[in-house]
Amino acid sequence: MTVQLSNLEHLPNYQITERLDVVYGSTVRSKHVGKDLFAGLKNIVGGELTAYTELLEESRQEAIDRMIVKAEALGADAVVGLRFSTSSIAQGASELFVYGTAVKAVPMQQQPIYQSSNQPPSHHSGHSQYEEPVPSAAQPSTTAQANDDLPRFNPFGE
């Protein structure tokens, strides 16, 4: 099985059975002087710096490959929580670092989805939205007078 990669903390449709260790891969690259001069000219007129794009793509792949070798050595099925980091090492040289957690994982069993043909009981009272509901004994009437002798404030002046 090839090592699967996920930037999530889990692997979709898999159950993580064991966390093995943190694994990483890195590469340090420097710019090519000739490509750097061309990139400097391109920077003046604008546009994509394809030499740098290619350099970064190669660096990412090399760092990932090195991390996968370490994960395979641990017997991992996947690496989760995948992250990238970069740092400047020296003038014109940068490190690309990738890391994650090597795990053992097994596919989850797909549970069949059952749909019930029974509908939940309706709570419809039989009244339309325009009819005034009939108060029941369980519901106190809003028009009932208070039984105490305290004065009541009525904002409508009634």
Swiss-Prot record:
Family matches, as SUPFAM superfamilies: YbjQ-like
Annotated spans, Disordered: 113-158
Gene3D superfamilies in UniProt: Hypothetical protein apc22750. Chain B
Top-level lineage group: Bacteria
Polar residues bias: start-end ranges: 113-122
InterPro entries in the cross-refs: UPF0145_dom_sf (IPR035439), UPF0145_YbjQ-like (IPR002765)
HAMAP family reported in the protein's UniProt record: UPF0145 (MF_00338)
Entry similarity comment: Belongs to the UPF0145 family.
Record-given protein name: UPF0145 protein Psyc_1853
Lineage: Bacteria, Pseudomonadati, Pseudomonadota, Gammaproteobacteria, Moraxellales
